[in-house]
Amino acid sequence: RLEELKGLRTAIEAWQLLGPDAPQLIVAGTGPLEAWAKENAPDTVTFTGQLPHGTLTELLAQSRAALCPSLCYESFALIPAEAHAVGTPVLASDLGNVGAAVQEGIDGLHFAPGNAAALADAVRKLQNVGETFDLTAMQQKACQAYNAEQNYRELMTIYREIMRNENS
């Protein structure tokens, strides 16, 4: 969703700071911030609208990086998980589950939430480091961390904690 809490404004402002040499940013989705974003985005930003999941996965696989500039504590960091599953590093705000899903310098880079200058610096760093991310390790991490068995174990841990709290 193109909304404040997802950090779209931070992304657009970072691309403004990067100037005409910025890499192409492709923004998928729709939402309340869409009109503002289109009005303020530099030419290096493209808006696709809503995409089918398969198309989005292909786009992630072809991308140099995925961007997750979230300004809120998300319950599950879906974009980093999907990006890592196809071997794409992630530029993520260092906040909550989004930040925790990225290991700095291993499978992506962090930046301060809501800080367009810090995001622009992370983009520049990504452009300068070349292909130094371990794509195989990213995919293995995603498969180990985001599978049905792991999700079941985590869910059962949460349920047990809830039951323990209700019985105290």
Per-range role (PLM):
Residues 11-12, 25, 119, 155:
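A structural motif in glycosyltransferase catalytic domains
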Residues 71, 88, 92-99, 113-114:
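Short glycine-rich donor-binding/catalytic loop of glycosyltransferases
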Residues 80-81, 94-105, 109-110:
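Short acidic/histidine- and often glycine-rich active-site loop of Leloir-type glycosyltransferases
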Residues 1-17, 32-35:
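A conserved mid-protein helix/loop that constitutes part of the nucleotide-sugar donor-binding site
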Residues 107, 132-145:
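A short, well-ordered alpha-helix in the C-terminal region of glycosyltransferases
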Residues 35-55:
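Nucleotide-activated donor-binding/catalytic signature segment of Leloir-type glycosyltransferases, i.e.
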Residues 61-75, 88:
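Acidic donor-binding loop of glycosyltransferase active sites
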Residues 104-105, 109-116, 125-131:
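Conserved acidic donor-binding segment of nucleotide-sugar-dependent glycosyltransferases
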